[in-house]
Amino acid sequence: MKLDRMRVGSRINDEEAMPLTAPESRARDSIDSSSTASISLTLVEGASHATTEPSKPAHNHNGRTQGNYAEKYRDDLEEDWEENNYIPTNGKSSQRRTLIVFWLLVALCVGGWAVAFLFFVTSPGNKTSTSPHSGSNSPEGDVTKPGIPATGKKIPLDDAIGGVWSPAEHTISWIAGAKGEDGLLLQKSEGGTGPYLHVEDVRNIHGTQSNNNSIVLMKESVFFVNDERISPEKVWPSPDLKTVLAMTREKKNWRHSFTGLYWLFDVETQTAQPLDPDAPNGRIQLATWSPTSDAVAFTRDNNLYIRNLTSKSVKAITTDGGTNLFYGIPDWVYEEEVFEGNIATWWSLDGKYISYLRTNETLVPEFPIDFYLSSPPGYSPKPGEESYPYVQQIKYPKAGAPNPTVSLQFYDIEREESFSVDVKDTLKDDDRLIVEVIPGSKGKVLVRETNRESYIVKVAVIDANKREGKIVRSDNIDEIDGGWVEPSHTTTYIPADPSAGRPDDGYIDTVIHEGYIHLAYFTPLENPKPKMLTTGKWEVVAAPSGVDLKNNVVYFVATKESPIDRHVYSVKLDGSELRMLKDSDKSAYYDVSFSHGAGYMLLKYQGPQIPWQKLISSPSNADNYIEILEENKKLAKLSNEFALPSLHYSTITVDGFELPVVERRPPNFDETKKYPVLFQLYGGPGSQTVNKKFLVNFQTYVASNLGYIVVTVDGRGTGFNGRKFKCIVRRNLGHYEAHDQIQAAKAWGKKPYVDKTRMAIWGWSYGGFMTLKTLEQDAGETFQYGMAVAPVTNWRYYDSVYTERYMHMPQNNEGGYENASISNATNLSQNTRFLIMHGSADDNVHFQNTLTLLDKLDILGVHNYDMHVFPDSNHGIYFHHAYKMVHQRKYFNLSFLGH
């Protein structure tokens, strides 16, 4: 869900079928990231669905210990609004719009609460001293002061949440040349100057040099088929760059999936034809290039087809797909929780086989979502039924309910036949999740599966040529450290190359090693014991980010300097020469994306100071190329004009664990005053909110404009502090996390500059659950106020894949589910006041969660809460711009002041 990475040797981003473009500048000067009207050049988000070389994974965090699997971090219950504010790093246009509305909603919802809270904290009897004083009662740890004068202007709320402070970012779509050339990217011209779609050498990104590697793919932004004018919305060039797969008329489905009309555009003739000439208006769910560029596999109406480019014929690979059977694409829960994308079709590297997932959700129960004010486009109720709500039925497996059953199928291109491969000792169908499929060379395929409670993990090697397979790795994570494994998307296939010192095929994986997540190299494929590439009391994060196969160098991002920092490192495939990228600072947060052959990289400095981006050659590349792509001069200018809070990084010790903390202090902070404190949290398993990223958001506004102290604590269960720190929450979500927030609040309440009678906490989604769990456990002793948005209140109501990973099935952990639910209404009644908000059409955290809690409150006659329901709003609560009403209402005036 987070940042995307292009796979090594691939032309696609596997998380989603690629949106067409992300705004880019032609010059070094910064651009306004909220305006693209004057931009004439953009870089295409994705290039092809064909995987023609060993893959590089998406950004995540997996691990194992000496051959034992670990996990990657996923915020399944959030939309990454806190971290990315308004500008997502992946450049996806449709997702960006969703995140914009989502973040605006979050901030404005809480804005109404915080502004009203201001009336409370500044009311008679709550005044504090304003005399200036330079004291020494400050927390220990790093202090980030961006050089902003305390007398600067205050940040308007609309600016803090509206993208004005979002760093300008550039997303590069790296692409391999037709002959494997490195350092190429896909570009799209917006302003009518130059060709519409072309491949360019990264060293000529501004178009100032002539270069033989430049290839024009589409001269114009439109093409015609039978006199129909067609404007492509997404494009994927073939690996040989002779044909472009174009999509139009996109319709969103779930978070990552969509449908559209697909076309084949011939680069030489600049003409196009339907992907399926016999069904040009058929809505296609997914289309992927063959690595040999001579065929496209696609799914339509849940059936898998193949189109051979040498003819206009389309062959059906499956025919029984329908409401409950999916071929080549995931169902809802696999898209959301397992693959984090819409792809379940994989070509072999030689183009001879297609691997595809068969998903059967016949036994999965349906959950109804009622829409009282809206309905899908084209829906017309029967006469006389206009007053009834539209009901959408979703196949949604809740904890303990039947999951979809899956199996991996194969299609032999030459023989035109489908087949399956029986592998001995695999998990039973009703207890199996297929979480990763990695095509290799010579018909080999790596398949990773887990049990539904995500603690038994098996890796199989299947030989499609011989139609046989075997389990080569098997581990029980529960026996290793009591933890879990999450779906992996980072495994990287390493082909044999005796001339480069690699006699056998292998793969790079992330493993748990001595309690931390590290890189390991398995070779040959059947070897269960890896060569450890990294070790130590720190963790790899994006692993690997790139692989230079010519020089046997692996690049990755890690927390070696500090859990809240990110730096780029390299290591040899033999485990030697571990080095930090020389451009890195000691205290910083970096991200990176690599070219096809890892000879070039887009290095992104993301904080704590003003972010910048550079295109540079990799250390293993003698080119010594460097290009400053973004300096964010506009953002630097803003930072000199406005008064921002100072950020104080520290740790606090709770039960022997060191918890990362960031405290945002108002400008002109005076230690003789007594400040109200707002705790903001997310806290989901493996997540991280305290880091060194530059971020101006709603929390900044609260500290800067309202004069509060805003504290964020990453308690136990969060990521990047080792397995012991994280896995302690297993089977008992909410207990340790809430305890840590309370202990942190008590520690802050003892500080001389904190008014411990005015402490509040708030969060969204998992953060909403954590807010209520903290208020429940605290029973009014430390926190007086809270706000929970779209909270989980009973883990039996959330989806099975996510929930059982941390809680096991309810049948196997009844007491844990009871403890993790929000059920102690008596304790909640001890708080001064709390607010619950939820959208009635939330398809992620169902409204059922809030209704169940309300019933408990009603039974015990609890009155110290308020409730706001947003009709027809989903998890983002933006139907009819509902956030505006939240922002305008005087809720906390009435709650705190009584008028």
UniProtKB/Swiss-Prot annotation:
Transmembrane regions: 100-120
Compartment(s) where it occurs, according to its Swiss-Prot or TrEMBL record: Vacuole membrane
Residue stretches of biased makeup (Low complexity): 32-43
One CC-aspect GO term: vacuolar membrane
Superkingdom of origin: Eukaryota
Membrane topology label: Single-pass type II membrane protein
Residue positions of the active site: S765, D842, H875
Keyword Aminoacyl-tRNA synthetase attached: no
InterPro entries membership: AB_hydrolase_fold, Pept_S9_AS, Peptidase_S9_cat, Peptidase_S9B_N, Serine_Prot_S9B/DPPIV
GO molecular function, one term: serine-type endopeptidase activity
Reaction(s) this enzyme catalyzes, per UniProt: Release of an N-terminal dipeptide, Xaa-Yaa-|-Zaa-, from a polypeptide, preferentially when Yaa is Pro, provided Zaa is neither Pro nor hydroxyproline
Residues linked to a glycan: N212, N308, N360, N819, N824, N827, N893
GO biological process: proteolysis
Keywords: Aminopeptidase, Glycoprotein, Hydrolase, Membrane, Protease, Serine protease, Signal-anchor, Transmembrane, Transmembrane helix, Vacuole
Coiled-coil portions: none
EC number: 3.4.14.5
Top EC class for this record: hydrolase
Positions in the Cytoplasmic compartment: 1-99
Gene3D superfamilies xref list: alpha/beta hydrolase (3.40.50.1820), Dipeptidylpeptidase IV, N-terminal domain (2.140.10.30)
Ranges where the record places region Disordered: 1-69, 128-149
Regions of compositional bias (Polar residues) in chain numbering: 128-139
PANTHER family: DIPEPTIDYL PEPTIDASE 10, ISOFORM B, PROTEASE FAMILY S9B,C DIPEPTIDYL-PEPTIDASE IV-RELATED
Function: Type IV dipeptidyl-peptidase which removes N-terminal dipeptides sequentially from polypeptides having unsubstituted N-termini provided that the penultimate residue is proline.
Protein family (similarity comment): Belongs to the peptidase S9B family.
The protein's name: Probable dipeptidyl-aminopeptidase B
Organism for this UniProt entry: Trichophyton verrucosum (strain HKI 0517)
Lineage per the UniProt record: Eukaryota, Fungi, Dikarya, Ascomycota, Pezizomycotina
Gene name, Swiss-Prot/TrEMBL: DAPB
